[in-house]
Design a protein with these regions (language model features):
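Acidic donor-binding segment of Leloir-type glycosyltransferases
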Residues: 12-55
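Glycine-rich, basic loop-to-helix element that forms the pyrophosphate-binding segment
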Residues: 36, 53-70, 91
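Conserved nucleotide-sugar donor-binding catalytic segment
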Residues: 68, 125-204
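Short aromatic/hydrophobic "clamp" motif used to bind/position activated sugar donors
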Residues: 75
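The conserved acidic donor/metal-binding loop of glycosyltransferases
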Residues: 79-83, 108
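Conserved donor NDP-sugar-binding/catalytic core segment of glycosyltransferases
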Residues: 87-118
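C-terminal, non-catalytic tails of nucleotide-sugar-dependent glycosyltransferases
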Residues: 143, 193, 200-232
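Boundary detector for helix-to-coil junctions that initiate low-complexity/charged tails
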Residues: 218-271
């Protein structure tokens, strides 16, 4: 959808260069454009199956259409402007094969624009804990066991867009296990035109709703985790950050100008 030709070619070629070769490459164009169709047609690889929507369906509906089309055991998610390193599929497939209890595996990744490496928590317990606070799996780098989605009747939901991936993960918290490979196998193109940047406020609003949903639906698990989370709040007076409140479980501290402790409590904060 509205993809830069250079980015699209780099994305396609990164998939065709995978060392693991037994896959079908499903490409769906949500807003068909003749120039993009010509780009895709220029790759004479029988694994490519190109389809296009007759009208714009949006991210969630398009992803669900691809899930229903897919014939494979695993679904390797991928966006139109990112890059999968050659060993990504091989290593994610190997992990899922060796760990049948795991429904989703992702990996460490590098942000191309910032030139920074991001490593999320690795094991299921750590990922689940973080999922209540923020998304702990990079979606376009993830590989999903299709049977988990089918058996639980799970799909992406448009009402959570553009955070539909985070919502899907949160609905899977008590249904399967997650894992992040520590190796960088993916390059994420975090540029001004991608969905996260274009819909930032909507993303933040949906994220808050998803977190509340996850905490309510996993109340017992969240209760144990909440006691260990450290919250930091700054209070400004006439635009100056004067007070800093640090809370963790039953304990709270209030600092003046981030240095002087002016209040400590095991139960609450009073200013």
């Amino acid at each position: 959808y509205k993809t830069n030709e250079v980015y699209l070619r780099a994305a396609i070629e990164s998939i065709l260069s995978q060392t693991f070769t037994d896959f079908e490459f499903l490409i769906l164009d949500d807003c068909p454009d003749e120039s993009r169709e010509k780009i895709i047609a220029s790759y004479s690889d029988e694994r490519i199956k190109y389809t296009k929507n007759s009208c714009n369906l949006g991210i969630s509906a398009s992803r669900n259409k691809l899930i229903d089309m897919a014939q494979g055991e695993y679904l390797a998610v991928f966006d139109h402007d990112d890059i999968s390193l050659p060993e990504r599929f091989a290593k994610e497939v190997a992990y899922l094969d060796a760990n049948p209890q795991c429904g989703v595996v992702s990996c460490a990744f590098k942000k191309l624009i910032e030139n920074t490496v991001n490593v999320n928590p690795e094991n299921n317990e750590q990922i689940t804990r973080k999922m209540f606070i923020s998304c702990a799996l990079l979606h376009p780098a993830a590989m999903i066991r299709k049977s988990v989605l089918d058996n639980l009747n799970l799909r992406y939901e448009e009402k959570f867009s553009p955070a539909e991936d985070y919502a899907l993960w949160c609905r899977m918290i008590d249904k399967t296990e997650f894992h992040n490979l520590p190796e960088v196998l993916f390059y994420y193109r975090d540029h001004a035109q991608n969905t996260t940047h274009n819909q930032l406020q909507k993303m933040q609003d949906r994220t808050c709703f998803i977190q509340a949903f996850a905490r309510i639906n996993n109340a017992a698990l969240w209760k144990g985790i909440e006691q260990q989370i450290r919250y930091v709040t700054y209070i400004k007076v006439f635009g100056i950050p004067m007070f800093k409140i640090v809370s963790c479980g039953q304990y709270s501290k209030c600092y003046l100008f981030d240095r002087i402790t002016i209040y400590y409590s095991k139960t609450k904060v009073i200013i």
